[in-house]
Regions:
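Class I S-adenosylmethionine-dependent transferase superfamily signal
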Residues: 35, 60, 132
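A short acidic, Gly/Pro-enriched loop at the edge of an enzyme's catalytic core
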Residues: 104-111
């Protein structure tokens, strides 16, 4: 899909996005916790790519109350929801932009992303990783908590069947599942191994996958000092 089509998908589902997400991410508490735990406690400048409605942003604020957060998203309706959550906080900057096109904030202690980058084609992921590396301070880190693809077609099918079983067990309705599958038209998920290789190729050090449950993973890399 084009950027405009992508924006339309997320604008259309913004109102129900948060309600649905908790039932559509098996093990969501461990997934988000793993991402938060990787960020150094003294991080003072954190940028979030694809902040959406601010669901992960509010967790960042709770974990890092003194840090300045820059929340970046290209969906105006999603960012409006984030402002409702965090709009009174003077240490939060809301940026309506496409993070794959426009410059990222510089000298960040950490750049994080949650369930966003998997919408990009592989080459755009690789280009973005280079931009992220340049935007970090030496020693800064990038954390990507994302929806990933299986390493082969057989495991991808297993992932999908497990996801359907898990979300139904969590109480997701068939409408919520249908809406999620509609959003997944936008997905361009990539396997963990490929993404870790691209991070190393971009120049990141200490690259690893720190959490994985089926098709959800948390990956991290550090800009060398």
């Amino acid at each position: 899909m084009s950027t405009n089509q992508s924006r339309t998908v997320f604008d259309a589902t913004a109102a129900t996005y948060d309600r649905d997400r908790m039932k559509l991410i098996p093990g969501h508490e461990a997934f988000y916790a793993a991402a938060l735990e990787l960020i150094p406690t003294d991080a003072m400048s954190i940028a979030e790519l694809g902040a959406g409605s601010g669901l992960f942003s509010i967790m960042l604020r709770a974990a890092f109350p003194e840090a300045h957060l820059t929340l970046i998203d290209f969906s105006e309706k999603m960012l409006e929801l984030a402002k409702e959550r965090l709009g009174d906080d003077s240490r939060v900057t809301f940026t309506l932009t496409d993070y794959t096109i426009d410059p990222l904030p510089r000298n960040c202690d950490a750049i994080v992303s949650s369930l966003s980058i998997h919408h990009l084609e592989d080459e755009r992921k690789r280009t973005l990783l280079r931009s992220i590396l340049e935007a970090l301070k030496p020693g800064g880190l990038f954390v990507n908590a994302d929806h990933i693809a299986g390493p082969n077609a057989e495991l991808e099918e297993v992932y999908q069947l497990r996801w359907l079983a898990d979300v139904r067990a969590l109480g997701a309705t068939e409408q919520q599942i249908s809406d999620s599958l509609y959003r997944q038209q936008e997905d361009r998920r990539s396997p963990v191994a490929a993404q870790l290789a691209w991070m190393r190729e971009a120049g990141f050090a200490d690259v690893d996958c720190w959490y994985k449950y089926s098709s959800f993973a948390v990956m991290c890399g550090v800009r060398p000092r």
